[in-house]
Amino acid sequence: MEVNLKNMAAELYIKCIDTNWFRNNKNLIEEKIKNLKTFVLQKNNEFWLKDYEASKDNKYFDVRLFLDKDEFILMEITFHPKGLEESLGFFLKWLRNNTTIIIEDEDGEPSSW
């Protein structure tokens, strides 16, 4: 899946079936995000990811993850080069190893992530 949107972003919702697990492990989730090789910045509950090798044109971030809700993680994708896909894949695999998740687009359709 190749997404290269100049002024738009794709939004995906990462939802944990067990919302109690999600709420109880938010700090652990945040630490996992901060340990990704593409992590660059945290602003409150907003986490910026960037693949510096592949996306020199994007000034600040390629993906933002928002953890301000108790029901889901909002993933806003502006650009996702291979290095970023690997980083997100690692994070999603870790989540799936700890709880059951579903990933949907903004229309509620299942995502292939």
Task: Describe these PLM feature segments.
Residues 2-113:
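Acidic (Asp/Glu-rich) sequence patches and key acidic residues
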